[in-house]
């Protein structure tokens, strides 16, 4: 498999950000990683791609498990879940409500 195919495969598997769907991290990642890996020697580029695939496979998450203090802040333990719920609720709202919502 060529370097470009490996990059395309890894970027396609990258999850979308539920809280900021208007930002396309995979697209940004694709652009920046292609430019950088093209300039590297093949052996170093493969190491970088392996690191990217390890991120996708949660290798580092499982190796360095984050503490609950990070995942559930003391000031509001359900902070991240409530953000996700609010975002989903906004997506389901009719278009006119989303357009004229007061901020």
Swiss-Prot record:
Keywords of the record, alphabetical order, are: Mitochondrion, mRNA processing
Gene Ontology molecular function: ribosome binding
Record carries keyword Mitochondrion: yes
Q: Where in the cell is it found?
A: Mitochondrion
Q: Name one GO biological process term.
A: mRNA processing
Pfam assignment, any one = UQCC2_CBP6
* Database matches in InterPro entries: Cbp6
- What GO cellular component entries does it have? Cbp3p-Cbp6 complex; mitochondrial matrix; mitochondrion
Q: Does the keyword tRNA processing apply?
A: no
Q: Which domain of life is it from?
A: Eukaryota
Q: What does this protein do?
A: Involved in processing of the 5' terminus and the intervening sequences of cytochrome b pre-mRNA.
PANTHER family per the record? CYTOCHROME B PRE-MRNA-PROCESSING PROTEIN 6
Report what the protein is called: Cytochrome B pre-mRNA-processing protein 6
Q: Which gene encodes it?
A: cbp6
């Amino acid at each position: 498999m060529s370097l470009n195919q490996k990059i395309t495969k890894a970027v396609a598997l990258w999850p979308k950000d539920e809280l900021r769907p208007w930002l396309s991290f995979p697209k940004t990642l694709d652009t920046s990683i292609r430019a950088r890996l093209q300039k590297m020697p093949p052996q170093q580029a493969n190491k970088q791609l392996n690191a990217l695939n390890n991120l996708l496979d949660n290798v580092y998450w499982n190796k360095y498990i984050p503490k609950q203090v990070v995942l559930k802040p003391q000031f509001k333990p359900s902070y991240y879940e409530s953000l996700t719920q609010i975002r989903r609720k906004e997506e389901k709202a009719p278009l006119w409500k989303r357009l004229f919502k007061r901020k």
